[in-house]
Amino acid sequence: MVDWENMKTLSVLFVLLFVSGLLLAQSTPQQQSQPQSPAQPQQPPPAKSQVDPLPDPISNNAVAALRVHWQLLLFSFMGMGAKKTGDAITNTAFSLDATEGNWSAIHPVPGTAGRIGAMAAGVRDQLYLFGGYVVYAQGGEMVVPDVGAYQPSHDRWFRSADIPKPVADSVIGVYRDRYVYLVGGRSNAGVVNNVQVYDVEKDMWSQATPIPGPAVFGHAGGLVGETIVYVDGARENPSGNPKYVASDECWMGKIDHHDRTKIQWTKLPSHPGTARYRIAGGGSETDQKIYFAGGTDNPYDYNGIGFDGKPSDPSPVTFDFNLRTKKWETINDNTPDPTMDHRGLLVTHEGLVLIGGMETGQKVTARVTLLSKEPKAK
């Protein structure tokens, strides 16, 4: 059941988030463009007194944020609706202007079908949307190589260079506000360990040092400075039944300062809580932390029913990896109304923003949630 008192508290916190100016932390998987310096300091317009949920329940939606000049925009791309079937997957897209406080439909993602498992990131003054997979009415699936660049200022899309090895359910991060990293994921041929790097200036791809652990998809993480951290996800089951099981491995990668394709990988100790799948993950340059919330310990395809045939439910554990101390930190081991089936987490100065997702009982939600970054008082 929904804790309405807690939801009221979250609503109040969200209002404070917008009124305070919503200075978005430098974060991954969504990096922000730097505003041009105005002649005189300019303040954001006052925020609306109420923040709406998404227009429709949506899960497995790619999310990102972008700040251009003094305007902060949050985005939700594609995803799966309440029916949790292939025909409930949509190519609709929405943006939220912090000064308005509600969601507006933007130009749909180009293509004949919607996708899930896609990755999104803001770079400079554009949003980039990568890969994902289509679910056909007959039951088949196909991972696509599509890369779309969206210009918020003109509400239009452009096609960018295809992903060399098409992937879905990868970890995404942005380096030096130019290079987008796709870490692992699954392709049409199976789960991959590739790290693929996209240069937004040259519209070109290169391959970086692969991940040394098991190939995984549905893992979570972020890129802060020159450091990538990812956790868990699903890996192929050697016994074959079920086909995929949760991976409990956590890894940190350091990008070579002189060669962006070289990554030194180090295995990390286990994080708080059990191994999980489709956690919401994202990092903060300001905090020097990578945050994680929700997810489930029972991997599934898209409807919330595990590969083992059992229903999946979200985990209540919220935690982070502190890049200064190189240690895991528990924020809340009993987060109210947890969610799963996420493709990213937006980090702000005031908290962690989750957009949509799947609640307990595999219920798709339109809820927009703000979680505290501070550890829960004992």
Predicted features and spans:
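Small-residue packing motifs within transmembrane alpha-helices
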Residues: M7, L16-L17, Y181
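Kelch-like beta-propeller repeat domains
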Residues: Q26-K378
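Positively charged n-region of N-terminal signal peptides that target proteins for export
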Residues: V2-S11
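Intrinsically disordered, low-complexity repeat segments enriched in small/polar residues
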Residues: S11-V12, T335
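Bacterial N-terminal signal peptides
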Residues: V12-L22
